[in-house]
């Protein structure tokens, strides 16, 4: 085991604080509408230019291992805030730096770190209550768009596109952001349920121009296993032919004589049919087939349930208004499923989302909810160069997360004023001793940091701006860095999602409290390895002159 380097008390805290300052100083220049960009070097390709706090934080790795500990702890604040709220990472970093700085000074002056931390936690809880009480629910299209515009640094098109996407797919719908080939923003909305499986044979195509198989008002057979034996599906095929309606078959796979017979019948015009593979793999495939069955009011034909293919009747099949199948995707529009059953299914999946600890599983479950409850929208971001596209995509991602957060927990006035005015709720809060009271005062002072930084990035004196706002009696008035005026921020559309502001403060207070209470730091000692010996000559080379 390698030898360890151990630093104690003041020496450890000073080094950790240096790391915190280096990371925070790089991140906080991006805060606010007039925040600057940061250029990130890449081992391959062009450098990346970003104004996204968490992207900057993730790139920073320091040479001194103790300074790096501080930087990595602060990076954790940005990452955690990003995971929970999707935005507010720079605000969280600025708050954490302010709390750590003041806390370290107090510890150096001889105060009890544990009582300081208790005071910080008390104050953070009180401020969160204040934010929740001031929060206003988001109701209309304009408010949703405004949250997106603010988070995307005043880019109106971004805000409008996100609001449009949300309006079309609903609050539960999935909205994804992709890079586009052109210069502009594009919005593609997929109605109904879409899954990534295309037709099994091009002979199923009904529209050769678009290379699409389209079925109007089809029956849908949902089968869990492989289909290779023709005899098992003959009875249901005959029933469908008599009904005169098209048929879509979804199964694990369809091969051999079963597929050949379907293709021949389609070409002869005896049966309008198309076949696709079932989406997903393993247990997830079965769950998705059950979703399709509920959406189309059909039954999943599974031998586990004792249903054999030979015994399937028409009333066991699902149906939909329209099905469209391309080479890659199948879209089921307007399934005949009962709304209350679909709602129950969505609730069941939601409870699975709450229970899961895996990010991947959570993402897949959320996709299933969206496909059942709303739809899928894709925002395609364009630009003149690859660097510009990536920078715009970062901003759209942030704006999308902020908008979702606003829909969940509502909005508060932006520009850092929600936190600044929350200092007034701490006036009546008293700690049990002087050290706890100092912890409360540290948070009170730190709550001014976001307003100060936004003003500073806009070229103003942060302390003067914060002082002027605190001395004023109107908690609706804030400093609008975009217009450089003091005005009613909520009325002019400068708003922040409550969830983003709340999460930023909670994560900052949590990690800052841990750093303040650190008394020793342990790192690996660099090993002095002896230089390797010169390799010996190769055999059989004797007698040669060099």
UniProtKB/Swiss-Prot annotation:
Parts of the chain that traverse the membrane: none
UniProt entry tagged with the keyword Cell division: no
Cell location: Cytoplasm
Keyword flag Nucleotide-binding: yes
GO cellular component: cytoplasm
Pfam families: Cpn60_TCP1
Keyword set, alphabetical order: ATP-binding, Chaperone, Cytoplasm, Isomerase, Nucleotide-binding
Binding site for ATP: 30-33, 51, 87-91, 415, 496
Enzyme Commission (EC) number: 5.6.1.7
Catalytic activity, as annotated: ATP + H2O + a folded polypeptide = ADP + phosphate + an unfolded polypeptide
Gene Ontology MF term list: ATP binding; ATP-dependent protein folding chaperone; isomerase activity; unfolded protein binding
InterPro entries noted in UniProt: Chaperonin_Cpn60_CS, Cpn60/GroEL, Cpn60/GroEL/TCP-1, GroEL-like_apical_dom_sf, GROEL-like_equatorial_sf, TCP-1-like_intermed_sf
Region span, Disordered: 526-546
Biased composition annotated in UniProt, kind: Gly residues: 536-546
Family recorded in the similarity comment: Belongs to the chaperonin (HSP60) family.
Function: Together with its co-chaperonin GroES, plays an essential role in assisting protein folding. The GroEL-GroES system forms a nano-cage that allows encapsulation of the non-native substrate proteins and provides a physical environment optimized to promote and accelerate protein folding.
HAMAP family membership: CH60
NCBIfam families: GroEL, PRK00013.1, PRK12849.1, PRK12850.1, PRK12851.1
Protein's recorded name: Chaperonin GroEL
Protein species of origin: Zymomonas mobilis subsp. mobilis (strain ATCC 31821 / ZM4 / CP4)
């Amino acid at each position: 085991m390698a030898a360890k380097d151990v630093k104690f008390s003041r020496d450890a805290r000073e080094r950790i604080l240096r790391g915190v300052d280096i990371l925070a100083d790089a991140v906080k220049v991006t805060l606010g509408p007039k925040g600057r960009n940061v250029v990130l070097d890449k081992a391959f390709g062009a450098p990346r230019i970003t104004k996204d706090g968490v992207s900057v934080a993730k790139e920073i790795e320091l040479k001194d291992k103790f300074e790096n500990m501080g930087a990595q702890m602060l990076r954790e604040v940005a990452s955690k805030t990003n995971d929970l709220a999707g935005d507010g990472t720079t605000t969280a970093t600025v708050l954490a730096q302010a709390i750590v700085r003041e806390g370290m000074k107090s510890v150096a002056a001889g105060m009890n770190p544990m009582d300081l931390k208790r005071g910080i936690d008390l104050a953070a809880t009180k401020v969160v209550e204040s934010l929740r009480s001031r929060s206003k629910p988001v109701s209309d299209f304009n408010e949703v768009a405004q949250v997106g515009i603010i988070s995307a640094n005043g880019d109106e098109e971004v805000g409008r596109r996100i609001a449009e996407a949300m309006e079309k797919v609903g609050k539960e719908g999935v909205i994804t952001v992709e890079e586009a080939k052109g210069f502009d923003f594009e919005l593609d909305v997929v109605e109904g349920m879409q899954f990534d499986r295309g037709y099994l044979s091009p002979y199923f195509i009904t529209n050769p121009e678009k290379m699409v198989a389209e079925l109007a008002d089809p029956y849908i057979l949902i089968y869990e296993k492989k289909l290779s034996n023709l005899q098992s599906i003959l009875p249901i095929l005959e029933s469908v032919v008599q009904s005169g309606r098209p048929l879509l078959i979804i199964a694990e796979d369809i091969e051999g004589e079963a597929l050949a017979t379907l293709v021949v019948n389609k070409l002869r015009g005896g049966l309008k049919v198309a076949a696709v593979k079932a989406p997903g793999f393993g247990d997830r495939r079965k769950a998705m087939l059950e979703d399709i069955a509920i959406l189309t009011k059909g039954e999943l034909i599974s031998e586990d349930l004792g249903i054999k293919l030979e015994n399937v009747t028409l009333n066991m099949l699902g149906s939909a208004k329209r099905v469209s199948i391309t080479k890659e995707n199948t879209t089921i529009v307007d399934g005949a499923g009962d709304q209350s059953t679909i709602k129950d299914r969505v609730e069941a999946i939601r409870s699975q989302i709450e229970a899961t600890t895996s990010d991947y599983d959570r993402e897949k479950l959320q996709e299933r909810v969206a496909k059942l409850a709303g739809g899928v929208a894709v925002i395609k971001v364009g630009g003149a160069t690859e660097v510009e596209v990536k920078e715009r995509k970062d901003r759209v991602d942030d704006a999308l997360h902020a908008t979702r957060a606003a829909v969940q927990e509502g909005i508060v006035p932006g520009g850092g004023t929600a936190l600044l005015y929350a200092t007034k709720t701490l006036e009546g809060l008293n700690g049990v001793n002087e050290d706890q009271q100092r912890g409360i005062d540290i948070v009170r002072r730190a709550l001014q940091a976001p307003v100060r930084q936004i003003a500073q990035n806009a070229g103003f004196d942060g302390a003067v701006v914060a002082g002027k706002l605190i001395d004023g009696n109107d908690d609706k008035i804030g400093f609008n860095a975009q217009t450089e005026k003091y005005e009613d921020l909520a009325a002019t559309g400068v708003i922040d999602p409550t969830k983003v502001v709340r999460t930023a403060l909670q994560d900052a207070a949590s990690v800052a409290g841990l750093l303040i209470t650190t008394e020793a730091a342990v790192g690996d000692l660099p090993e002095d390895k002896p230089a390797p010996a010169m390799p010996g000559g190769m055999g059989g080379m004797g007698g040669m002159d060099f």
